[in-house]
Amino acid sequence: EMAKPSRKLGFTHASRKGPMIVCLDTSASMYGTPERISSTLIALLEETAEELERDCFLIDFSVSTRAIDLMEKRKAQRLRKLGLTISEEHPSTTHLPFIGGGTSAKKMMKQMFELLDNDGLHYVNADVLWITDFLIPDPPQSMLARFKEYRDTGTRFYGIRIVRDDDKEPNTWKNYFNQIYTIKYRPLRRY
């Protein structure tokens, strides 16, 4: 009688726990309730990234951009709790700054592409999340083509769209993302 093998060989996808790049819209249209929602999301993302041991880089944008390595910020906070100090380029804040003004994705996308291209910063195979209302003017076609190129080569792009519950604006960005989730809110009434 022939012995039956006790195991089967199979193919299983490796779980991807690479870095994350989070692009946060801090334009005037995100003021108020959307700002509070996005601040909460960023705090949850920070905790989740730490639990999953995933590096996380934040780019907040409106007309200008500001980049923050969230994991470095967390490490600095832990060191301060131990009584150790390190010099910081940006002062630590407990909440995200509100920049205000208009919205332009050009600078943010350039910074995002630089992170995705730079092997030394280990964000090459990052997942990208945009937190915005997606009321963003289209950047030049060359940038959109590059966006699509990254997506076609395995970079996953996700969006969280924060809009009023009566929002009827079509989202022109949806074809560039793997998935866009929507959070609807009802504005508070002032009596």
For every predicted segment, state its role.
Residues 45, 145-152:
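Catalytic-core regions built around general acid/base machinery
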Residues 1-20:
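Negatively charged sequence features
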Residues 52-54, 124, 153-157:
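Loop/turn elements at helix/coil->beta-strand transitions in domains of secreted/extracellular proteins
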Residues 15-126, 128-131, 135-139, 160-171:
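Von Willebrand factor
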Residues 76, 82, 167-191:
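Von Willebrand factor A/integrin I-like adhesion domains
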Residues 33-35, 139-142:
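Conserved ATPase-coupling elements of RecA-like P-loop NTPase cores
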Residues 142-146, 172:
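A short acidic, amphipathic alpha-helical/loop segment
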